[in-house]
Amino acid sequence: MSAPLEHHTPMMAQYLALKGGYPETLLFYRMGDFYELFYADAEKAARLLNITLTQRGQSGGQTVVMAGVPFHALENYLTRLIKLGESVAIAEQVGEVGAAKGPLERKVVRVITPGTLTDTELLSDKAESLLLSLHQAARARCGLAWLSVTQGRVHLAECAHDELGAWLARVAPSEIIYSAGVTQRFEQQLQALRQSGAFDCPMRTRPDWQFDQALGERKLLEHLGAASLQAWDAQDLGAAQAAAAGLLAYAEHTQGRALTHVHSVQAQRGDELIDLPGSTRRNLELVKTLRGDDAPTLLSLLDNCMTGMGSRLLKTWLLEPHRERHQARQRLSASTALRGAAAGAGPWATLREQIKGASDVERITARIALRQVRPRELPGLVKTLQKAQLLAQHGQIPEPYLMQIFDQLHPPEGCAELLQAAIAEEPAALVREGGVIATGFDAELDELRALQTDCDGFLLDLETREKARTGIANLRVQFNKVHGFYIEVTSSNLERVPADYRRRQTLKNAERFITPELKAFEDKALSANERALVREKWLYEQILDRLQPHVPALTRLAQALATLDVLCTLAERSLTLNWCAPQFVSEPCIEIEGGRHPVVEARLAETASGSFIANHTRLNANTRMQLITGPNMGGKSTYMRQVALIVLLASIGSHVPASSCRLGPIDAIHTRIGAADDLANAQSTFMLEMTEAAHILHAATAHSLVLMDEIGRGTSTFDGLALASGIATHLHDKTRAFTLFATHYFELTDLPAKARHAINMHVSATESGADIVFLHEIQPGPASRSYGIQVAKLAGMPPPVLHHARRTLAALEERAGAGQLQVDLFAAPKEEPESKSASPVEAALAGINPDALSPREALDALYQLKRMAGK
């Protein structure tokens, strides 16, 4: 508000002072049983939450606009706001009533943002809440740092500006922060990336001074307890360290304390992971279907994990496969050992049964470190620690990776015992409600509780004595939270009330009194209750203090338990779905016998729609490209996707849906499959297709797998054919990537005659009268025809349309048979003339750095170039 604080009422002055620290955040201000919002916050909340907007009184010469929500329904409203990308600051009453003049003391106790969630009610069991920080560095470089507050690991990376979109799509943050000092061009790039779909989350600016490289390095070293970042291969990531400074400052700001549970840093290099662009993740339906649903996807098929932390880890494995095979071999060896020699013979089933029901140790540990853990989470943690101790006894399984995991499952000494002794078996939801600390843990608390327990006996005894003394048979001695203890007498018996009865409350048909004896007991009992609650709160804080040294060990245990959960799940899935172990080799190849599409096969089994037709794939040094032709609905896209999914599954260390699989080095999986117009960004299907194809041609290498499906649609036949042939030739001759190239242009089947590493394949179909039967088999050679009219018939096309189409097709085929000059689509293009040495203008232009010029310098440079060009 514009008026100075001294012109406002004391309460509104307090509110505005708090709000000043959180100008871009909705402030929930606790008032009794409600959280109130005022002024612009109230108007925004009323609109977003559909709650009532009211006006009440004036402050600072203006009407106070307000809206509120009940305190007991807070989590519901927070969930809705977070899903809308909003952030919320919670201001609680921290002072005692009557302790000071003026309004009750309040302070902001936590800030809830989409990227820093820790509350169980706000988090999805199977998804992380990720905060990502960006730092614009020199030479068109960018530093990235991100973390999940509940996980406690900081990730660092650096990239060129033109690679930022790919990194944001890979990380998929829930919230992005960046320095307020970035250039306008960088900010425009971020907005363009969000519009393009590279990410979809709120962005916020933070003070420029927080993004300091030296500060970031110091903070990271403090968290690691180390003198150098060299052991984490992060010593040379200065831009990422600057991003980490902003990241940790913001995360600490939202949690209201240091992140003491952050003990791990992971530096990620662009060449460490198999590249899975956003189009690949989308087209292969890894975690979302093309319609945006969670199932059926590859993740939904794989995820039979028993814990939420296992599900989250499996998703990370799936989206971050490593190029180097050591990790995949490790996981594959472990899951194979868990499988045993045959179904039911391995230890996976026993282990999964023991893991079942385990608490989310990862998130509980983070909340312990942040002192936000709820009492009801702790008994579950005790049971999980006991489960972990039993699981650790399986360490005799003779498999190196599993032995490491079991070794980390031993609970920290004394942790479970402390919690078992200190926390009630069924504690209250909140400490302030009492009943959290177990009986017998603290003698003083037990004594205070005994006073409360004796209350019922005293009241019954007093009621008996007062009935005898007054002769009032229906006299009652009772208690409520508003009026305390009282003796209730009906109106018809008021003449019998003794002189020492003092009136406390008048009702319609009765009066309530208190006596000196009852008043003395009330003071003692209520005091005991208040003191017991204070004692419980103090004891709970002491317990959290004693748990802090166990946080690192609990974090390691959580990671081990999640890893074991995923490995057992992969073992179970491989047995249930009849998958085989892939073989990793050094020579370049993708050789699959009896490959199946895992999701399609599972859907067929669920719906009893028949069995999946397996197919072989052989790509190696001699055959790097398959040109696939055949009718629509024949299975071309399914075949191509299944090859990519098998490669991906093998790369994460899973068994694969095939009879056998040999896989060489892979650095990326690129896909160009299907499209729809991007109306929001004014891009047609054809433009999207060409954009994605261009990206693939620039990014793919000889170790990449490329899927190209029906490239060239959306323009004229000749244009599409020419482009398709050019793209296929480039992939074969220049890129030399492993390529599955499905096409409806039969002219492209001439390519293998001139390209030594390409072969024709087709999806088989057969005619039965006027109908078509799809065999879904991939066979050598080109397709003989496309069966488009038969497919149209299956789709329900009206008979007159089909009749017209058949006559037109016959005429076109007859005309084509008359013979015309055949254009050689695959003739080597004429060499482009060698580029001449750069002209003076070009040399001068190449030496200009537009980002380093002031507007005046840019104008001077332009005139200089103009003069040079005119000579």
Swiss-Prot record:
Organism superkingdom: Bacteria
One annotated GO biological process: mismatch repair
Job description of the protein: This protein is involved in the repair of mismatches in DNA. It is possible that it carries out the mismatch recognition step. This protein has a weak ATPase activity.
SUPFAM superfamilies (alphabetical): DNA repair protein MutS, domain I (SSF55271), DNA repair protein MutS, domain II (SSF53150), DNA repair protein MutS, domain III (SSF48334), P-loop containing nucleoside triphosphate hydrolases (SSF52540)
Region (Disordered): 830-849
Keywords: ATP-binding, DNA damage, DNA repair, DNA-binding, Nucleotide-binding
InterPro entries named in the record: DNA_mismatch_repair_MutS, DNA_mismatch_repair_MutS-lik_N, DNA_mismatch_repair_MutS/MSH, DNA_mismatch_repair_MutS_C, DNA_mismatch_repair_MutS_clamp, DNA_mismatch_repair_MutS_core, DNA_mismatch_repair_MutS_N, DNA_mismatch_repair_MutS_sf
Record HAMAP family: MutS
NCBIfam families documented for this protein: mutS1, PRK05399.1
Gene Ontology CC: cytosol
GO molecular function per UniProt: ATP binding; ATP-dependent DNA damage sensor activity; damaged DNA binding; mismatched DNA binding
Residues at which ATP binds: G630, P631, N632, M633, G634, G635, K636, S637
Protein family: Belongs to the DNA mismatch repair MutS family.
PANTHER family: DNA MISMATCH REPAIR PROTEIN MSH1, MITOCHONDRIAL (PTHR11361:SF34), DNA MISMATCH REPAIR PROTEIN MUTS FAMILY MEMBER (PTHR11361)
Claim: Ion transport is one of the keywords in the record: no
Pfam families: MutS_I, MutS_II, MutS_III, MutS_IV, MutS_V
PROSITE patterns: DNA_MISMATCH_REPAIR_2
Protein name: DNA mismatch repair protein MutS
Organism: Verminephrobacter eiseniae (strain EF01-2)
Keyword Methyltransferase: no
